């Protein structure tokens, strides 16, 4: 009898495991959104790093679903959903953004709606570009993470450092910001939080001189390929591990 119950439990667990869908939310600004290559004759960047990352992850696990309120990418991209918002700062991801005639909500709307299992977060570039109380940007980032954890306590958060620009002064500010964010992530990890560091700035090795940018800020198609490689290396190990956790959540 006990053996029968045990086998039944395994069967039911395996059934849930097979049905589990892992929801991934790319979250950030225009670098996550993509599509800012304006030079004639250059490959499009529509879909950003997602154009290369999505099919590679789907080849590992077909039960992945990219989620978000926005949709962008080339026709060949099977899943185009994301939360990349052009010009947005850290604080705006929390509170939303007021436009001349409209208001767009932030994570307090998106996260409960899409309930992601994995969040790919890259944000902070616009805080520096807009010179928006830069010294307080790391504190705003901590508040953002606190809110994400409150709204989606089961989610795994992968945090990418901000990438360089073609301006040395801005890069110095970006490096300082990245360093403080990294320290925060390490502190969170020591407390058992499901939060991980992706050193995009150094691992992607992107440079204006190498043709990795379409302008002073946004990656070119080549730059996005490098970003996709880094994301893939960090996300792939979580895909299968998250499957079981998602099945238990159902």
Q: What are the roles of these predicted feature ranges?
A:
Residues 18-20:
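Boundary at the C-terminal end of the N-terminal hydrophobic targeting segment
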Residues 32, 36, 54, 58-59, ...:
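Sec-exported extracytoplasmic/periplasmic mature domains
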Residues 122-129, 145-177, 201-204:
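Active-site segments of SGNH/GDSL-like serine hydrolases
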Residues 81-86, 163-245:
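Catalytic His-Asp segment of secreted/periplasmic serine-dependent ester chemistry enzymes
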Residues 4-14:
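Sec-dependent N-terminal signal peptides
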Residues 27-31, 67-72, 121-126, 160-165, ...:
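Active-site-proximal beta-strand/loop segments in catalytic clefts of secreted hydrolases
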Residues 23-25:
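Conserved beta-strand elements of the Class I
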Residues 34-139, 170-179:
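Conserved SGNH/GDSL esterase-like catalytic core that processes O-acyl groups on lipids
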């Amino acid at each position: 009898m006990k053996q029968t119950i045990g086998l039944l439990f395994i069967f039911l667990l395996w059934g849930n495991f097979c049905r589990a869908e892992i929801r991934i939310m790319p979250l950030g600004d225009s670098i996550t959104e993509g599509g800012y290559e304006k030079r004639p004759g250059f490959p499009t960047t529509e879909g950003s790093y997602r154009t290369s990352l999505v099919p590679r992850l789907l080849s590992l696990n077909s039960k992945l679903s990219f989620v978000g309120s926005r949709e962008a990418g080339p026709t060949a991209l099977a899943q185009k959903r994301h939360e990349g918002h052009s010009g947005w700062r850290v604080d705006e991801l929390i509170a939303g953004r007021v436009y001349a005639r409209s208001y767009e909500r932030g994570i307090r709307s998106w996260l409960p709606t899409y309930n992601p299992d994995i969040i790919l977060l890259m944000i902070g570039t616009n805080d520096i570009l807009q010179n928006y109380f830069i010294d307080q940007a790391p504190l705003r980032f901590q508040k953002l993470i606190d809110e994400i954890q409150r709204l989606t306590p089961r989610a795994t958060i992968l945090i990418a450092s901000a990438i360089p620009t073609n301006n040395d002064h801005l890069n110095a500010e970006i490096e300082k910001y990245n360093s403080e964010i990294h320290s925060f992530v390490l502190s969170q990890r020591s407390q058992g939080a499901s939060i991980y560091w992706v050193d995009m700035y150094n691992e992607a090795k992107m440079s204006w001189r190498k043709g990795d940018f379409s302008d002073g800020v946004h990656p070119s198609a080549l730059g996005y390929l490098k970003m996709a490689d880094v994301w893939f290396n960090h996300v792939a190990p979580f895909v299968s591990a998250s499957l079981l956790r998602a099945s238990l959540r159902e």
